[in-house]
């Protein structure tokens, strides 16, 4: 009886635990089912996209690799340029990059200043349209006479009518050309010439003659500039957009 009692007592005492275990098991199953409902395979349209994840990782690694290679090439180019600069700058082996670049900038400024002061570059045409006239008197000791000359400079855009306009001015003023020099660079031109006025003598007002010559050359420059402006405006109208605009404008007016 004691054994029977103990057995029954054990079974009775363990009954709640058995029931409790079964409830926990059911609860765990329901929680797992809810977890599966939240992340079911149908929500992904099939199996979990492991291939897509692998492909994304490979793509990211490829982009990172290409970025590292591009950065390496950029550093190599910079280092090669710095090496070339070190060869041009004396005693630059111990200079860091910032000091090297500062030294190069200073040398470039010095070279630019020397080039601007060189007489070779002073005769080059400038961006501004200008006319200069400088009268000079040359004495001839043998004949005991003075000759008046004009050193003139004419700078403008390189236009075909510039020469003809200058020739017209010189012919009108009866000036003799002793020397002429034409320099054309980058669509600009400068004409330096030395002129002689055979009609001038010691009683001639040199300043008035120089002023008249400069005024005539300035008038010629204005004609050349206006002609250049008209030509450039005609060339601009030849663009496709403006041709379309003008044609549509005229068609509406008609």
UniProtKB/Swiss-Prot annotation:
Disulfide bonds: none annotated. It comes from the Eukaryota. It comes from Arabidopsis thaliana (Mouse-ear cress). SMART domains: HLH. Residues 62-111 form the bHLH domain. This is Transcription factor bHLH51. One of its GO terms (cellular component) is nucleus. One of its GO terms (molecular function) is DNA-binding transcription factor activity. Induction: Repressed by salicylic acid (SA) treatment. CDD domains: ACT_UUR-ACR-like (cd04873), bHLH_AtAIG1_like (cd11455). Gene3D superfamilies: Helix-loop-helix DNA-binding domain. Pfam families: HLH (PF00010). Homodimer. One of its GO terms (biological process) is regulation of DNA-templated transcription. Expressed constitutively in roots, stems, and flowers. Keywords: DNA-binding, Nucleus, Transcription, Transcription regulation. It is found in: Nucleus.
């Amino acid at each position: 009886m004691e054994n029977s009692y103990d057995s029954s007592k054990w079974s009775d005492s363990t009954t709640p635990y058995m029931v409790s275990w079964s409830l926990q098991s059911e609860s765990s199953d329901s929680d797992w089912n809810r977890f599966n409902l939240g992340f079911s395979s149908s929500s992904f349209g099939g199996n979990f996209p492991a291939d897509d994840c692998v492909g994304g990782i490979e793509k990211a690694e490829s982009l990172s690799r290409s970025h590292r290679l591009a950065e390496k090439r950029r550093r190599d180019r910079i280092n090669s340029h710095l090496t070339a600069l070190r060869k041009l700058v004396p005693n630059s082996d111990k200079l860091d990059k910032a000091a090297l670049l500062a030294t190069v900038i200073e040398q470039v400024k010095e070279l630019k200043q020397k080039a601007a002061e060189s007489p070779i570059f002073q005769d080059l045409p400038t961006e501004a349209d200008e006319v200069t006239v400088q009268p000079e008197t040359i004495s001839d000791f043998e004949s005991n006479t003075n000759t008046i000359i004009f050193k003139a400079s004419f700078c403008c855009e390189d236009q075909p009518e510039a020469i003809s306009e200058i020739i017209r001015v010189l012919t009108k003023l009866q000036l003799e050309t002793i020397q002429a020099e034409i320099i054309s660079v980058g669509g600009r031109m400068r004409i330096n010439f030395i002129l002689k006025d055979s009609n001038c003598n010691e009683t001639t007002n040199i300043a008035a003659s120089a002023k008249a010559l400069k005024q005539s050359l300035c008038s010629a420059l204005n004609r050349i500039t206006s002609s250049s402006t008209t030509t450039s405006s005609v060339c601009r109208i030849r663009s496709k957009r403006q041709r379309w605009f003008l044609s549509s404008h005229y068609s509406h007016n008609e």
